[in-house]
């Protein structure tokens, strides 16, 4: 099964549905990637901070070696972590991440957060997380402009075909677009019916920046992180609005939530290690929700953000 794609402003096509690597266990990651490729997934969304890029690369290599897929048919995404925002740190860490994946280039390399932290030597701790080598929250003075200029050089050197940002507000995008020589191809944000961010999505798309949603199932991704809001918020899978629409279309609640995004040209990156759910999550483009159903789902908005750096105890 293949999915439609979004034409990026860089000229490349990005699949509308991909497989996210956040919280994918290192022990099972290689197999999960391999089986996802067999199921038809072509976009894989990784990051330094996820700590599983070596294993993900092994899954990709196995699929390529067995002739299931060619490298050029895959769309591999990774992210620049906060500790490497200084201009002279961007290229070295990108090269390390490429080596971890066993790749020559990333299809898309993203600034993970608009937060610059003090450099942590990968030889000391990797992934570095939020704390410095002194186990304190320490910031770098690197500006977004300094970081973005270094990101642009990755495209010049063919280490990344496209570059993008994540967790940026509209105001930060406005600032970035004033000086960007290479415009961000994508914006990845937390996006689900409890956090619709409609104005941000509209602005980004108007500027020709493709939007990718993470945590499409809302609190589900954050319950195991023991976040109070996630525990106290009704699960979207159990919400009467979502369940009713799913029943009407003969789909699962997960498929409805994903289609709510993809029908508005927002890419999604769910994950699963269940073969049935893998196939179901990929089947979220060949059928449509009614306009009234999209509106009903969007009306569930609470402006409730789960992935909030200010919620981290050390901040």
Curated annotation (Swiss-Prot):
GO molecular function: aldose reductase (NADPH) activity; D-xylose reductase (NADPH) activity
EC primary class: oxidoreductase
Disulfide bonds: none
InterPro entries, per database record: AKR (IPR020471), AKR2D (IPR044487), Aldo/ket_reductase_CS (IPR018170), NADP_OxRdtase_dom (IPR023210), NADP_OxRdtase_dom_sf (IPR036812)
Catalytic reactions on record: xylitol + NAD(+) = D-xylose + NADH + H(+); xylitol + NADP(+) = D-xylose + NADPH + H(+)
Residues given in the record as NAD(+) binding sites: 166-167, 215-224, 271-281
Residues involved in substrate binding: 112
Superkingdom per UniProt: Eukaryota
Protein name according to UniProt: Probable NAD(P)H-dependent D-xylose reductase xyl1
Pathway(s) it belongs to: Carbohydrate metabolism; D-xylose degradation
UniProt GO BP: D-xylose catabolic process
Xref: CDD domains: AKR_AKR2D1
Residues at the catalytic site: 50
One of the record's GO cellular component terms: cytosol
Gene it is expressed from: xyl1
Family: Belongs to the aldo/keto reductase family.
Documented EC number(s): 1.1.1.307
Keywords: Carbohydrate metabolism, NAD, NADP, Oxidoreductase, Xylose metabolism
Residues of the site described as Lowers pKa of active site Tyr: 79
Biological function: Catalyzes the initial reaction in the xylose utilization pathway by reducing D-xylose into xylitol. Xylose is a major component of hemicelluloses such as xylan. Most fungi utilize D-xylose via three enzymatic reactions, xylose reductase (XR), xylitol dehydrogenase (XDH), and xylulokinase, to form xylulose 5-phosphate, which enters pentose phosphate pathway.
Pfam families per UniProt: Aldo_ket_red
UniProt key word NADP: yes
